[in-house]
């Protein structure tokens, strides 16, 4: 069984990397991390584009659609 961790984010340039690291420190090994950037305008997108981590999948919304939409996008892509 795989655990899917969905992280919706909007303008989280100051916190997104520490959030990812916190999830990766969990004892659960069979997991996937899905980040849905909901149209960030503060550099979050640039940070995520530079992230080279096979455990993290990133999905971008072209514009802000709200937290619920970001979660639904993540759920639709989740394997767990």
Listing of model-derived features with the role each one plays in the protein:
Residues 1-80:
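Structured catalytic core of nucleotide-sugar glycosyltransferases
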């Amino acid at each position: 069984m795989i655990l899917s961790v969905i992280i919706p984010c909007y303008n989280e340039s100051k916190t997104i990397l520490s959030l990812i690291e916190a999830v990766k420190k969990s004892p659960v090994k069979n997991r996937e991390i899905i980040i849905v950037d909901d149209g960030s305008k503060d550099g979050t997108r640039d940070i995520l584009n530079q992230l080279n981590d096979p455990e993290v999948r990133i999905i971008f919304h072209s514009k802000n659609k709200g937290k619920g939409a970001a979660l639904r996008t993540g759920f639709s892509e989740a394997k767990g």
